């Protein structure tokens, strides 16, 4: 018996193409960069000084949770893991800041901003057509 060779004109099924694998690698790289940035921003012994812009702290909190959420989803991590772990991490990070970092303080509003960033990332992921995700 001879095996039929696939018709190159037909779309491939099964494993992702080389382009898809390459794109996923980029999302994984961005995810790791975002996670490292998140750890530095959340757990630095003292909050970095800067201009006092109203609401900037909340935007930063939303960003350091939203970016890893979006990159993880785009990398193909199941949404339940992304949402579960990051939503759990939000209050934990505030508790650590309040109890273990003397020059930092925990804030419920920061936790709300964290979860808002995660929700915005999920919303962005859902509106990106699947064919454009990777």
What are these regions (language model features)?
Residues 2-111, 115, 119-134:
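Bulky hydrophobic segments
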């Amino acid at each position: 018996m001879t095996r039929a060779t696939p018709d190159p004109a037909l779309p491939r099924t099964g494993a992702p193409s080389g382009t898809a694998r390459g794109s996923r690698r980029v999302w994984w790289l961005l995810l790791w960069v975002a996670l490292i940035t998140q750890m530095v921003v959340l757990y630095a012994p003292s909050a970095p000084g800067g201009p006092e812009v109203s609401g900037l702290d909340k935007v930063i909190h939303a960003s350091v949770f939203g970016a890893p959420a979006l990159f993880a989803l785009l990398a193909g991590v199941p949404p339940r893991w992304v949402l579960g772990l990051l939503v759990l991490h939000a209050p934990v990070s505030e508790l650590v800041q309040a109890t273990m970092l003397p020059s930092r303080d925990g804030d419920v509003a920061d936790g709300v901003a964290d979860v808002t960033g995660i929700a915005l990332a999920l919303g962005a992921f859902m509106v990106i057509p699947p064919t454009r995700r990777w």
